[in-house]
């Protein structure tokens, strides 16, 4: 079965230089994939002319759509909504809405993508604020879903509860975790720690659990501190978008620094170069495990269609990973699973134990709707 994905080719720091090459790399990885690419036709054709010969054969599965306007990274959400007509981002989302594609991938302005996604695709019933989620590696070889990553920098209790429910469905559907362990990110595990919205969300999740002991769809384990994200103590970690984005960016920076320093250390002297040659297979495995590029692509959970956000600074390889994430979500029919699960629940149905024991106007939720200095605080 052919899988069709709409690409906003003009998003991201590198623009079509990364998105065009990354899209062709994705086509080489997925033989059933067809890409609908939106952007200024002349610019896209120029990039296609520079493709390596090994990728030129995949152009037959790439369809160009002329979309001359670009939504910049600095554009505020309200401006993007007003000026979206003719843009590559709106074109890609419209392709999903009109059935020409099954998913959209963009490296563009996150706030604009979320707001336009809500307008064009709608949201799943019962979800007022979609959230951005991605998986991060854990030391036990597994993955942990972190959300929100920047779509909602100012959240209420009910939004955090919704994020917990959506993250649990993501872990069940994508990673086949039977009963995902869900935690709230906090500055301590004590009951009195954290801001009011986090404490209230903790209370709501615990009260829900006490009413539904034995029929849980996820296991609420309470508060988790930052170091627990990578320990494997939880399958889903929930926080507001400001905190989540800061955690993700700091983690990416740390991973990049560690890999760079490790390589520099092994290259410093002849003896270590010899050791490096012998240790090369293990080093490559470590790099593959920690390289942030491999985890590129964040899901906009809660939309009624599939939209994947690529990191703005991603290169072609990273963008290809984001496209692959969209392919997987199509295969899993993720929005339908979310809609069914949340409809069946009506409200969350977690079981619970302590984390300490295991170790008009589209309201985007963004501060950029109110303060121009925060116009793009997210990925």
UniProtKB/Swiss-Prot annotation:
It is an enzyme of class 2 (transferase). Coiled coil: none annotated. Its main location: cytoplasm. Keywords: Cytoplasm, Lipid biosynthesis, Lipid metabolism, Phospholipid biosynthesis, Phospholipid metabolism, Transferase. GO terms for cellular component: cytoplasm. It is found in: Cytoplasm. One of its GO terms (molecular function) is phosphate:acyl-[acyl carrier protein] acyltransferase activity. InterPro entries: FA_synthesis (IPR003664), Phospholipid_synth_PlsX-like (IPR012281). Pathway: Lipid metabolism; phospholipid metabolism. It holds the Pfam family FA_synthesis. GO terms for biological process: fatty acid biosynthetic process; phospholipid biosynthetic process. It catalyses: a fatty acyl-[ACP] + phosphate = an acyl phosphate + holo-[ACP]. Homodimer. Probably interacts with PlsY. Catalyzes the reversible formation of acyl-phosphate (acyl-PO(4)) from acyl-[acyl-carrier-protein] (acyl-ACP). This enzyme utilizes acyl-ACP as fatty acyl donor, but not acyl-CoA. HAMAP family: PlsX. Belongs to the PlsX family. PANTHER family: FATTY ACID/PHOSPHOLIPID SYNTHESIS PROTEIN PLSX, PHOSPHATE ACYLTRANSFERASE. This is Phosphate acyltransferase. It comes from Chromohalobacter salexigens (strain ATCC BAA-138 / DSM 3043 / CIP 106854 / NCIMB 13768 / 1H11). The lineage of its organism: Bacteria, Pseudomonadati, Pseudomonadota, Gammaproteobacteria, Oceanospirillales.
């Amino acid at each position: 079965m052919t899988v069709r994905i709409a690409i906003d080719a003009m998003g991201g720091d590198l623009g079509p230089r990364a998105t065009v090459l990354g899209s062709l790399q994705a086509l080489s990885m997925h033989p059933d994939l067809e890409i609908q690419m939106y952007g200024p036709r002349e610019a896209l054709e120029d990039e296609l002319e520079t493709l390596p010969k090994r990728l030129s054969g995949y152009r037959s599965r790439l369809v160009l759509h002329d979309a001359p306007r670009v939504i910049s990274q600095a554009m505020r959400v309200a401006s993007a909504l007003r000026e979206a007509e003719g843009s590559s981002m709106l074109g890609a989302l419209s392709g999903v809405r009109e059935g020409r594609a099954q998913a959209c991938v963009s490296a563009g302005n996150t706030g604009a993508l979320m707001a336009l996604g809500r307008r064009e695709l709608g949201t799943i019933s019962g979800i007022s604020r979609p959230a951005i989620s991605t998986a991060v590696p854990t030391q036990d070889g597994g993955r942990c879903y972190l959300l929100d990553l920047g779509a909602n920098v100012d959240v209420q209790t009910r939004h955090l509860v919704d994020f917990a429910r959506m993250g649990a469905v993501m872990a069940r559907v994508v990673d086949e975790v039977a009963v995902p362990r869900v935690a709230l990110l906090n500055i301590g595990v004590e009951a009195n720690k954290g801001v009011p919205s986090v404490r209230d969300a903790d209370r709501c999740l615990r009260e829900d659990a006490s009413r539904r002991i034995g029929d849980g769809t996820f296991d609420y384990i309470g508060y988790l501190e930052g170091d627990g994200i990578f320990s494997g103590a939880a399958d889903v970690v929930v926080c507001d978008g400001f905190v989540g984005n800061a955690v993700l960016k700091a983690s990416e920076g740390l991973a990049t620094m560690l890999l760079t320093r490790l390589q520099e250390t092994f290259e410093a002297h002849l003896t270590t170069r010899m050791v490096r040659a012998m240790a090369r297979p293990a080093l490559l495995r470590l790099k593959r495990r920690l390289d942030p590029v491999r985890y590129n692509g964040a899901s906009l959970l809660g939309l009624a269609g599939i939209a994947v956000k690529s990191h703005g600074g991603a290169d072609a390889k990273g963008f290809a990973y984001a496209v692959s994430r969209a392919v997987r979500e199509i295969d899993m029919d993720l929005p339908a699973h979310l809609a069914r699960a949340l409809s069946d629940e009506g409200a969350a149905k977690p079981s619970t134990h302590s984390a300490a024991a295991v170790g008009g106007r589209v309201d985007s939720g963004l501060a950029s709707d109110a303060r121009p200095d925060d116009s793009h605080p997210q990925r």
